[in-house]
């Protein structure tokens, strides 16, 4: 059962909007269309429509988020793998995600949507707003157990690991002993990632040249999950400076001021709502395999000459290009904290997304599944 990361599965939307931000934007659609990932929606001008549709609006009273008026977003294909194999339904290579891993399983005799399934979710939100997802996830694991006659192997990537940990922490040990055989964690950001501060301050176009970082920033800020991924104090020193400007330094003790200074105070509320969700870092209570990339330059801190609207100078440290090594190594602490085995495997030179299709990863999964 595959659990994707942030941005890691398709989202669909249907519109019936009172107003639009640009005359080129659709106001009403008869059916659902692909909101993520559809490269055509990210072109100049059209991207304004996309941002207005995919953003979330934070409600300070209910502490939850809602879509803009007249936008209905759904997650296609729960229980299936298509929406995480290719993020772009046209199967363009740019959106290839879980495909290589799933196809390898199929080559070994597994069947898509039968004994290999996907658990996509609305990755814009944190687990506190995705309660129905966890109910469905539990039911699906039980169903897979019944249909296939044995416990399930979970494979999660990136933020999907935070979701998986949250889920496992809420199941009884008896349930986990019965239904979960192994848990493979790929590129898990257990302690948050330094890159998040840049995403919130000035945006990050993920190296997609047609997109301006400042444009996409509003969408990235509005996703609760971005704020959930800020570095945590159980991983990083309290005095580490993540962001510096000519007039201020920001450590993880300065988030409230950081949000005020970037003029996004809702973010501080979102962070407070989500910080406790896996803060205890309770071990998962199942046999675990932590695979993590090293040896790739990973953003570690940022210097802004003009804060926050200009791109920063980036300082790097070790990791997989996204997840800093110290965040990935949380797994080590669990080795002596649970009776089930915790195995760590360093993937040297493995980038955050590429590790999913890396030969080492795939052969590790194969050995695990076939007890080789």
Each predicted region: which residue ranges?
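N-terminal non-catalytic accessory region
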Residues: 1-155, 159-220, 239, 244, ...
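A short acidic-Thr-Gly-centered motif at the start of a beta-strand
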Residues: 109-111, 146, 281, 302, ...
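Glycine-rich, aromatic-lined ligand/substrate-binding cores of catalytic
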Residues: 222-306
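Short, surface-exposed loop/helix-turn segments at secondary-structure junctions
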Residues: 301-317
